[in-house]
């Protein structure tokens, strides 16, 4: 089915749009309305980019193809969206690749290895042109019945903390760090930090109550979700 997938790297990330075979076949009708679900809120630039895509589709189809946008996890959250896509509950979805894809093919974790790829292009070429990458990507597409539509760059990932200035490895010890993906856990353990697994929708309250004080995320998310209030 459809995917709006985010490749997370510890230096940069980008996301791509996939849409379901079911959606493309249904679009053969004279008019069709599809549904796009994502966990990002309406202030997040990923949502704004997705809306630009939706507007372009509507224009290019002369109004025959309309996509309704459901942001902020109205339909599915960051961890639930794969189920919604696979079941056909939505036609397109915003999927964080390293959250959803390793459950389908564990070898997709190669996308999380810091420094392995020099650029977005090199990472994309691995999945599209190399034998092993094509094998991984083909398995994902076959099992989710989806196809790639576009890439949408997100930006760099940084570590933010409200506990103290992160001046070195010693400063990382005993931080209360949010973990989104499994690949983050070995890093935080090596630093001696306390680890708390949280969905995006749970981060604000966790920062507010002191459950966590540190997070890995793109700077744009800090602003979009008002996390900056606790990470100054």
Regions found by a protein language model. Name each.
Residues 2-15:
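Bacterial N-terminal signal peptides that target proteins for export
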Residues 23-29:
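Sec/Tat signal peptide C-region and signal peptidase I cleavage site
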Residues 35-52, 72-76, 222:
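Extracytoplasmic "Venus flytrap"
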Residues 43-68, 182, 186:
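Short, polar/charged alpha-helical segment
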Residues 54-55, 91, 96-196, 227-230:
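Contiguous mixed-secondary-structure segments that line small-molecule binding/active-site clefts
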Residues 63-65, 81-95, 193-195, 209-217:
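Alpha-to-beta junction loops
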Residues 69-83, 165, 180-183, 195-209:
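Short helix-initiation/N-cap motifs at beta->coil->alpha
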Residues 97, 183-185, 194-232:
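Pocket-lining segment of extracytoplasmic ligand-binding domains
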């Amino acid at each position: 089915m459809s995917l709006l997938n985010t490749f997370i790297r510890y230096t940069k990330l980008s996301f791509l749009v996939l849409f379901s075979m079911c959606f493309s076949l249904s679009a053969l009708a004279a008019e069709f309305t599809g549904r796009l679900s994502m966990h990002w809120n309406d202030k997040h630039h990923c949502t704004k980019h997705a809306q630009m895509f939706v507007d372009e589709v509507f224009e290019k189809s002369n109004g025959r193809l309309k996509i309704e946008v459901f942001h902020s996890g109205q339909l599915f959250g960051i961890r639930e969206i794969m189920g919604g896509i696979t079941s056909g509950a939505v036609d397109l979805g915003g999927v964080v690749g390293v959250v959803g894809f390793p459950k389908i093919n564990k070898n997709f974790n190669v996308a999380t290895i810091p420094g392995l790829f020099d650029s977005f292009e090199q990472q994309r070429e691995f999945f599209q042109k190399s034998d092993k990458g094509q094998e991984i990507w083909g398995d994902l597409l076959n099992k989710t019945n989806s196809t790639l539509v576009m890439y949408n760059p997100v930006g760099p990932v940084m570590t933010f903390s409200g506990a103290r200035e992160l001046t070195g490895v010693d400063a990382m010890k005993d931080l209360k760090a949010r973990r989104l993906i499994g690949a983050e856990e070995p890093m935080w353990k090596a630093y001696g930090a306390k680890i708390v697994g949280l969905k995006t929708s749970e981060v604000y309250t966790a920062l507010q109550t002191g459950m966590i004080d540190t997070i890995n995320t793109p700077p744009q998310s800090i602003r979009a979700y008002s996390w900056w209030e606790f990470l100054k």
